[in-house]
């Protein structure tokens, strides 16, 4: 089904990220980082000793649950209300389009706001869209769900930046570790698809799962990234 295809796609992306060889950073910049580290602080010997990197990887996994969760749930709205026009697949491009627009707009405002402030606002507004969709009738519910894409669009770089704070020469290794969080995109849609298709659970439980993802990323943004 569509959930299996989403999971396979996410696994493929994760495999590419795992095996791809990232280019080395500029040598002069690396030397400057090491010199600055000697002057300012003593970095730990391994990236694995920084808890906020692990928390960041899990935040990326949770974000993947949010990003792919909406396309996973949208067909259930048509199943619950056959009177809705068209089909879920006809409206999914609006979700991805909203994410694309959000990324263009977000790139212009990322430099003007603190990462924690912007990410917190996007999480709250995205959660509001998803929550409201559960109570709205007909296409209004669909539009509210699709609107969440605008706020999801800038979360990835913000989570990534918070997970790479104050790592100096260990930044490259940490980025690889955080990228492994994309594996969450391979598992969470499958779980959510199972929940949505279960008559005793359904969309309501899937939305509660998304609120767990929102809550964790919010915690990471304001607390976990500082550890």
Across the structure, where does each feature detected by a protein language model lie?
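Extracytoplasmic gate region of multi-pass secondary transporters
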Residues: 45-93
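Helix-to-loop junctions at the C-terminal end of transmembrane segments
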Residues: 102-115, 196
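C-terminal membrane-cytosol helix-exit motif in multi-pass small-molecule transporters
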Residues: 4-33, 217-225
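Juxtamembrane intracellular "pre-TM" segments in multi-pass secondary transporters
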Residues: 28-56
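Loop-to-transmembrane helix entry
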Residues: 81-98, 173-177, 205-208
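Intracellular juxtamembrane helix-capping segments at the cytosolic ends
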Residues: 153-168
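Interfacial helix-cap and linker-helix signal at transmembrane-aqueous boundaries
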Residues: 78-79, 109-110, 192-201, 206
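Structural signature of the two symmetry-related core transmembrane helices
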Residues: 117-132
């Amino acid at each position: 089904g569509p959930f299996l295809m989403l999971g396979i796609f996410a696994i493929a992306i994760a495999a590419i990220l795992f095996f791809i060889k990232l280019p080395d950073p500029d040598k002069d910049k690396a030397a400057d980082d090491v010199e600055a580290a000697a002057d300012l602080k003593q970095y730990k010997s391994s990236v694995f000793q920084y808890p906020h990197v692990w928390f960041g990887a899990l935040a990326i996994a949770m974000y993947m649950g949010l990003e792919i969760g909406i396309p996973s749930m949208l067909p259930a709205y048509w199943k619950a209300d056959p009177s809705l026009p068209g089909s879920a697949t006809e409206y999914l491009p609006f979700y991805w389009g909203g994410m694309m627009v959000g990324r263009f707009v977000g790139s212009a405002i990322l430099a003007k706001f603190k990462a924690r402030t912007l990410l917190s606002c996007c999480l709250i507004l995205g959660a509001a869209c998803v929550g409201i969709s559960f109570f709205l009738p007909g296409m209004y519910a669909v539009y509210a769900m699709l609107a969440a894409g605008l706020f999801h669009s800038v979360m990835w770089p913000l989570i990534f930046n918070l997970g790479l704070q104050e790592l100096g020469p260990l930044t490259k290794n940490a980025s690889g570790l955080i990228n492994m969080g994309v594996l969450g995109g391979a598992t969470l849609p499958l779980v959510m698809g199972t929940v949505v298709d279960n008559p005793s659970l359904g969309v309501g439980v899937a939305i509660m799962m998304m609120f767990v993802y929102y809550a964790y990323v919010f915690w990471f943004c304001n607390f976990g990234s500082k550890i």
